[in-house]
Amino acid sequence: MGKKQTKPINAKSRSESNVVADPRFQSVHSDPRFSRLKRGNFKVKVDERFKSLKEDKDFKTTASVDRYGRPLNQDKATKEIDRLYELENEGSSSSSESSEITDNEEVASASSKSTKSEELTDEESEDEEVYDPARGEGIISTSESSDESDAESETEAQPEISELAGIEPEENIPRGSETNRLAVVNMDWDNLQAVDLFVALSSFCPPGGKLLKVSIYPSEFGKSRMAAEHVQGPPRDIFTPADNQPSSAELHEAQKFGFDNNESDQDEEDALIEEDLGNEFDMVKLRQYQLERLRYYYAVVECDSVRTAKVIYETCDGAEYETSANIYDLRFIPDDVTFDDDESREVCTKAPEKYEPRDFVTDALQHSKVKLSWDAEDPHRKDLIKKAFTSQDIEDLDFSAYIASSESEDEDVDVIRSRYQKLLSGDADDFQANSNPFEDDDKLEGANGEMEVTFTSGFDVDNNANSSEKDETTIEKYKRKAAERKQRRKELRQLKKTKDDEGEGSDVDLGFDDPFFKDKDASRNNKKNKKGKHTQIEDPTAASKEELENLVREDENDSEQLDHFDMKSILKAEKFKKNRKLKKKASNLEGLQEGFEADVSDPRFAALYTNHNFALDPTNPHFKRTKTVEKIMDESRKRRSNQLEQTQDGKPELKIKKRKAEKGDQRQELDRIVKSIKRSGK
């Protein structure tokens, strides 16, 4: 019997009775959005890379039982994969296989034995664990054959990688005899200083050992390269040529996607905001150049003994300096090698108290994208600018490494000295008004003509005088001003001494015409004397000997001084007098001044009774009741009572009446205003 014919799924093959003839839905029959998919289109087609999808057990692992504990069919996972996935060449191969079945029956029977053996080997290989890093399964093979193959592949790939990175193959350099000096080579000297090496290597010294000095010298290779870079800049090989056109393969790829060669050029505006991808450099040559910069300098480490140098060599050689990707490359220096002829870049003999290492990474040793460091800013200078210094740090800091000299390098020092000597020892007759002492003598001799006199304002003179002050640092400016103030005070003291010695009528010129050093009070007195309106003011501090004797005189009749009393003794005596037993002790106390009586009517102490600041408060805990205090309080009461008697003439009462009248007038005026507002509102 033939196969049962099924109705086609396509809408065109349907019977006319099922077709909707409504013109509103006419587009449904032709619109692909409403057409049904074919069964073959349900499957996802995969290429040969995913051929193991149907064979690998990892894609077919399912649960052995369902959620109710019933056993599941293990072929369900295989059927599910066949239903969803299909290889690209599977559809075409299925038709060809059906036609060739009859021809290959004999071949299949003959090769059945071989296939069985292959299946056995496949099953054995499947039982073995396979290394799959994606799933984290399997064990790395450690057989000798794999090691040999890996070694061969590494040896084949190593020259290519080193050549691509610009790294020269390692040389077998002999270690040599052990000495107390070590050389450090192949380091990033743009970021490393002698202090960094001194501190880092000092931490590896054995007990009792120490570093004496770390010096950094330029190598012969570095001297020649730096001299060439000073004139010509970095080598041209590191830059890509300007006429670098895309290759034929790139053009073919661009034309394949519909891009024209002219469209690849960007506008100027796009170039301004274009990201720096390093396309202007040849990365291989740039990396090689950056690695060559590691050989521009070398460091010499001097230890106190051979034992210390040996320990540092064995510990640090081949280790990384912090996280900078720089590897210590240490060599012993023979004793007969000297560095007296070489000029060191920097020397460190002592670790600073507050040391902070710099965090840096050498891109040429670690990153795929290398940056050119030839024109980079000095990283130590950047740290110096950002750091907040104390006054002691500023004094200890050496600015000579970061500030250029004020004198020109091309100018001879002897010529400058001779010019200054001409300025100091030259006569006024020989000096020309329009000549410059810093010009060459040949120019001065050739300048013949009339003398031209020019006048400059005082502002220009002050600006020229203060030009040197602008170049001063903060500390130098502070010290200079302090010295000027000290000198000014000294000159003022000398001026006063000379005035006292010579007298007021002396007209001797002291050599000071500056108005700053003149006494303001003296100038005022001189002006008044010239006008004749005022006489010269006498010094109020001058006192005669008689007045001083009166202030400290002693009473001839009394043995004690007039101002001699002891307040503590007086308070004790007042307390002892209240107790009969202690009355005798009160008479033995000194400094009582028993015969002294205060003159409460003295006008000099009138403020005690009028000023509230001197009012006495008996409730205050610091109040001390004595005879003199009680006398003062009685006097204040008398004066207050006298003031009340003097007010009987009625003046205070009149003031009170006036205030009451003023308040009444204000109330009447307010009532009038309220009434007027009410009338206007009606």
Swiss-Prot record:
Residues 471-597 form a coiled coil. The modification Phosphoserine is found at residues 117, 125, 506. Residues 1-32, 55-176, 457-564, 634-682 are annotated as: Disordered. It is found in: Nucleus, Nucleolus. Residues 120-131, 145-157, 501-512 have a biased composition (Acidic residues). The modification Phosphothreonine is found at residue 121. Residues 90-99 have a biased composition (Low complexity). Keywords: Coiled coil, Nucleus, Phosphoprotein, Ribosome biogenesis, RNA-binding, rRNA processing. GO terms for cellular component: nucleolus; nucleus. The keyword DNA-binding does not apply. Residues 478-491, 525-534 have a biased composition (Basic residues). InterPro entries: Esf1 (IPR039754), NUC153 (IPR012580), RRM_ESF1 (IPR056750). Residues 76-86, 468-477, 515-524, 544-554, 662-674 have a biased composition (Basic and acidic residues). Its main location: nucleus. Belongs to the ESF1 family. Involved in the 18S rRNA synthesis. Required for the early cleavages at sites A0, A1 and A2. This is Pre-rRNA-processing protein esf1. It comes from Schizosaccharomyces pombe (strain 972 / ATCC 24843) (Fission yeast). The gene is esf1.
